[in-house]
Amino acid sequence: DLVLSKVERRIDVTSQIARVTKTLKVVNSGSESVSEFALTFPKFLGNNLAYLSVAPSEGKGKSKRTLVNLSVREADQKGLPDSISVYSVALPKPLSKGDTLTLEVVAAFTNVLQPFPEKITQGEIHLVMLQESAQYLSPYAVESQSLSIKLPNARIESYTKFENTKLQGSELKYGPYKNLQSYSYSPIVVHFESKAAFAVAEKLVREIEVSHWGNVQVTENYNVVHRGAQLKGEFSRLDFQARPNPRGASAFRHLLARLPPRAHSIYYRDDIGNISTSEMKSDSKKTELLIEPRFPLFGGWKTFFTIGYGLPLTDFLFASEGKRFLNISFGSPILDLVTEKLIVQVVLPEGSKDISVTTPFAVKQSQEIKYSHLDIAGRPVVVLEKNNVVPDHNQHIQVYYKFSNINLLSEPLMLISGFFILFITCIIYTRADISISKSSPSYLAKLQWDEVLATLQEVQSIVQKCLATHDKLEASLRDLSRTGDIQTCKAARKSTDSLLKDLSKELKPLLGFLQSFPSASHISPKVEELVVKEKELQEKLMAKHTTVVEGYEKKSSGRDIENRIASQQQKIIALRQEIEDLLEFIDEI
Amino acid sequence: MAALESPLPGTPTAMRNAFGNVLSVLILVLIGVLAFSIRLFSVIKYESVIHEFDPYFNYRVTQFLSKNGIYEFWNWFDDRTWYPLGRVIGGTVYPGLTLTAGTIWWGLNSLNIPLSVETVCVFTAPVFSAFASWATYLLTKEVKGSGAGLAAAALLAMVPSYISRSVAGSYDNEAVAIFALIFTFYLYIKTLNTGSLFYATLNALAYFYMVCSWGGYTFIINLIPMHVLLCIVTGRYSPRLYIAYAPLVVLGTLLAALVPVVGFNAVLTSEHFASFLVFIIIHVVALVYYIKGILSPKMFKVAVTLVVSIGMVVCFIVVAILVALVASSPTGGWSGRSLSLLDPTYASKYIPIIASVSEHQPPTWPSYFMDINVLAFLVPAGIIACFSPLSDASSFVVLYIVMSVYFSGVMVRLMLVLAPAACIMSGIALSQAFDVFTGSIKYQLGASSNSTDDAEDNTSTNNAPKDDVSAGKTDKGEEIVKERSSKKGKKKEREPADKPSVKAKIKKKALVLPLEASIVALLLLIMLGAFYVIHCVWAAAEAYSAPSIVLTSQSRDGLHVFDDFRESYAWLSHNTDVDDKVASWWDYGYQTTAMANRTVIVDNNTWNNTHIATVGTAMSSPEKAAWEIFNSLDVKYVLVVFGGLIGYPSDDINKFLWMVRIGGGVFPHIKEADYLRDGQYRIDSEATPTMLNSLMYKLSYYRFVETDGKGYDRVRRTEIGKKHFKLTHFEEVFTSHHWMVRLYKLKPPRNRIRGKAKKLKSKTSSGLSSKSAKKNPWV
């Protein structure tokens, strides 16, 4: 059978977690080789055991310690009292007779530091109590053992005293004890002040969303509670602000989150908006986020908040054997935070296949589908659940999956085709004639009306051209006044004359066409009027032109000519005005 | 003008038309982007969060809607507010906004775009202001052409008055209601211009949406009848008018009655009577016109006498019925808010609760300049432009601006209704002015370029009449104008669009201005526009973006954030029992229910004056009496807002007189005079003992003196009157970081000891509390 030749136990209670480190030297003094080793804890500790790892360390040198953890499972308690919990450790190789093995055991317990008194006022200090055994509880005989408890650097209210108990500074030592029977037990109680933040996340949901566009988005929802002694009575802000140290020592204001390096787009908010009290420091090694909840947390007070950050994909996603794997830490980045219920959801991109997860410790696994940005099939979500998580669980997990890069393009293509279809429908809708009945009177009337409008536009453009020719005529007159070249002027008149005639020829069929439509009955008189007016204007202009040219031929003075054409000029202006009015009227149709 | 000069018919004109259309669509899209993005200052400077008070309620309702669905929403009885009465939310809320946002959220989520309800709510207002500016374009286009439409849309996109109610996060009814208002008006004008029943039906639907969205729909249902009446009186009756009006009244009223909050009010209250009266009148007029058409003039005269006599009788009967109806209802059939519109002094006389809201006060002159800025100067020009020529549509906008100016003068909140009218008017004014000036410039430049060598012409820019005929439309001149227009930004880029161009030409002929004058005037107009833009951006960024639940102050060592409200709401929501009741003044009711999820006694929906008065009475009573009132209401926590430490002026001490007034209005033992020293409201050593012993005073200043030793109140700028006192019936449970919110818990009643119980009894029977106990229905 086994004998523990030497046991050293160190309990660290400087934070809210009691972290126990044990060095066990196991000797097989029996005749058969042994391949299993039993670890026992008192039940009240065993129930609160959050983390347990056992590693063999060969030799005494510190550097030689191997990091291979041995597999640990909860063993059934055959013939043992209920007040003991047992874990069995599979040894790396069977321990044959007379062999020695050194085991390093790390165990973390939550909720073992009981606040006492359970309710304190704002001004009182926060005292907690630790119960342990001065002697190592073991199914094996122990030859030599010692216990040291590292207390926070503060007041120590009381502790159980035995003859070989020593208090050195903030370190309390029990032992050494020699040659004790198996299952020897001597309870001790340490009552001391704790300044640590008793921050407990009742529930933490971490969503890790992988985007192959280059980002891993982490969103963490915390329900945090202060699990220390509850606050009783008033909370006075005055006292808290004026004398924060005695009057608020039991509260914590800050939490420090140590995020991976190159974390970006960090936010800190709760369900009613952004929380502005946070501070970030970052360098190439790490990103430190100091967050302050909306209010200082006293014992029993709760709060809720969300932290989110993006991480570069290249730091976390790797490829191996045709598969990709995400290598990311499991627990919360907040230091010294105990999580009662941790749910990690790894959201993989749409179209991932063959998903498998490896974790360094047992977790509950399941899979879900999440629909996010324009998903059709949905994204596979790996859900990992674990209760009672301590910072020691902050180890990397690996999620393996297969993903083809073509899937990346599906959503942009979908968007593009969506817009494409939208525009195409718009084009078709505006171009196509989608009236139901092609023979209904309203449809025919509409067609007719379209024709009328087209004709009107033609008429308009011809009249405009006429007007433009008129302008040319006027221009030629001005040239005349400058150069005195009568011949060119006459030529201009001739050309415009013929041009105008052509135009009026063009107008005629249009007019007839317009009159043939019943729906244009209220327009055609106006159009006719326009044409008549235009004709008149033509004549007037010609007359004026002739007069001016004649005047120049007769070499009469400019003033004289002007006097002669003055009346004509007025009429021209009036006519022109009328034509423009008519044009405007037609235009408004 | 381009279209008119095109040498070939057909293609170039069509091309230019298309170009103009594409350009105006592009400009409209840009206006939409502008309207959306100018409202994002609050998100950029602060955060994406719901603002102020009412938006929190709407947000909460939207959350409920998105979680539980529409049927649950209609039947929702909210037990988190007005404890112990509760409130039937489905039947007392204008559902337009929540349904809109809920639908958007649902649509996005069914497309798998996972936006939170909060995000949708925050951005609903900016999105709808883009819609509103497009609706303004449509409306103004119907009135004065697309040029004016674009100008008006651009102005509306950034008018500060509208920004103040529609920045991102300001999730209030007005955000969608202004869009609905303008769109309803547009459809009315469109129906009036086309006489199409299709648009008339759409108009009724738009009106329905407006009724769903905002109580301000009564503005529509009174303005449109007034316009119809105006048209009839000025002899502008036409079948189009009938089509525009009659379906609206019938369909609109039926649809409005479908909205639970309106229900039978749509036919019963006086706000709607004008529409029915005009409905009768328009039928009479239609009949008269019809008879006039089928009868000879002689017969018609006979008929007129007949009809008039019968009509008089009918009218008399109807009027008698109306009068009887109006007289039978207690407030004369008018709601308090409507009455205070008709008689601005009504609220302050009779309903202190309406008067106590700052947005129900009349505005000051500077607020006009602040809210509509240069538009105030452009509006008269726009009105003049509307009169030349006066059409049905332009007479409508004139009526609209006149009415809205009156209403905005009564209540500062209705400045919002004025803003679109002012934008439309200013858009018309600007567009006409630009037409005139650019027309003149073009004409002048055309003239000079045409005769650059002509010595005579260079000197004579003023002999306009002669050049008039010959000048103008050479290609060169046009090119110059086009170049300029492209430089001068979008307001003039629409110039190539052919429609207003002809008008411009007419104008040009009528009013040709000298080149220098028009250039200077143009520059001045552009400067005016620039000032407007600068002011709007400033207003959006500085004045109207603060969410009011987060305050910031700029000090020497950087930006300081005061997030006290959310700090204490978060505390309440996480550290009190879910069914605890929190009493506070009604301003904070909506926020407490939405952010802290705790039951409140009164909230911002001030429907029960007595209940509010009870809380007001408690706040103004001494501690013991207040404790009894609160205890009778199951209150566990009392929340007060206190700004004395950091100088936050809108705290409860400054609102205290309203609590006294409202409380005193129902419980007469609270007298305003008891709280005033010689008519002055003060909290220093001169204050009255009633004041110094009131619960509000004590809860605000509890242990305040210990902060600086003197108790100097930074808001009132004085030392407080009573410095050292203890609370016997309340205990402080939470005070926020800057002391802005203080939460107190009611101490449990003490066990009765024989002697003490007697003593207590004698005290209460003599003190104020017994009175309040009698009056207070909850005791």
UniProtKB/Swiss-Prot annotation, chain B:
Glycan-linked positions: 597, 604, 608
Chain positions of motif DXD motif 2: 172-174
Annotated localization: Endoplasmic reticulum membrane
Annotated site residues (Interacts with target acceptor peptide in protein substrate) in this chain: 54, 359, 655
Catalytic activity: a di-trans,poly-cis-dolichyl diphosphooligosaccharide + L-asparaginyl-[protein] = N(4)-(oligosaccharide-(1->4)-N-acetyl-beta-D-glucosaminyl-(1->4)-N-acetyl-beta-D-glucosaminyl)-L-asparaginyl-[protein] + a di-trans,poly-cis-dolichyl diphosphate + H(+)
Regions of compositional bias (Basic and acidic residues) in chain numbering: 465-501
Regions of this protein lying in the Lumenal compartment: 39-124, 164-174, 212-216, 265-272, 327-364, 411-414, 540-779
Signal peptide start-end: none
Any one GO CC term of the record: endoplasmic reticulum
Motif mapping: DK motif: 652-659
Binding site for Mn(2+): 54, 172, 174
Annotated spans, Disordered: 448-501, 754-779
Span of the annotated motif SVSE motif: 356-359
Expression tissues: Expressed in the root and in the shoot.
S-S bridge residues: none
The enzyme's E.C. designation: 2.4.99.18
Pfam family, one: STT3
Domain of life assignment: Eukaryota
Primary localisation category: endoplasmic reticulum
Subunit note: Component of the oligosaccharyltransferase (OST) complex.
Similarity comment text for this entry: Belongs to the STT3 family.
Protein name per Swiss-Prot or TrEMBL: Dolichyl-diphosphooligosaccharide--protein glycosyltransferase subunit STT3A
Organism: Arabidopsis thaliana (Mouse-ear cress)
